[in-house]
């Protein structure tokens, strides 16, 4: 299946609050609600779209500037000072990445959807896509997937639909041949052959 999904997330300027007090007042007084219709698989959300900006430049920006200065020292100092500067800049890198990961990861309460989707490189984009597809933990920064619960299909099983792919918790279904197992238990040769057969069938169909 060749699927390209284009989507956008926006925070309207008209909904921006001047400070947290104004935002809290708007949220407390809001009469909207969120409702999930399991029969039609629709989400109804009439809650307030008010938001407030929390600039991090005064915090993260200072760490970034300090790290850049340390990186600049690596070329012009002796071996001992270079080792010391490299260690310090690596620590600052972890501080910066951890803060970003907490704000960007869907597994934290303070996660930010817009921040999580603003990728600056193909590698983080790939990690985010893996996170969505395989329901991994903290793959945005440091972490990995659940190696004992890898989703896979039996060789005769049909490919899952978008409903299952959008909610991986619905994946396991022994009647449909949808299983979860450890990485080492999967017969990768069969998986590869099935993929190749599907590609050949698709090419014949398209031609």
Swiss-Prot record:
- Protein name (database record): Uncharacterized mitochondrial protein ymf29
A single GO CC term for this protein reads: mitochondrion
UniProt KW keywords:
Mitochondrion
Tell me where in or outside the cell this protein is found: Mitochondrion
Q: Which InterPro entries match?
A: DNA/RNA_pol_sf (IPR043502)
Give the principal location in a single coarse category. mitochondrion
Q: Which SUPFAM superfamilies match?
A: DNA/RNA polymerases
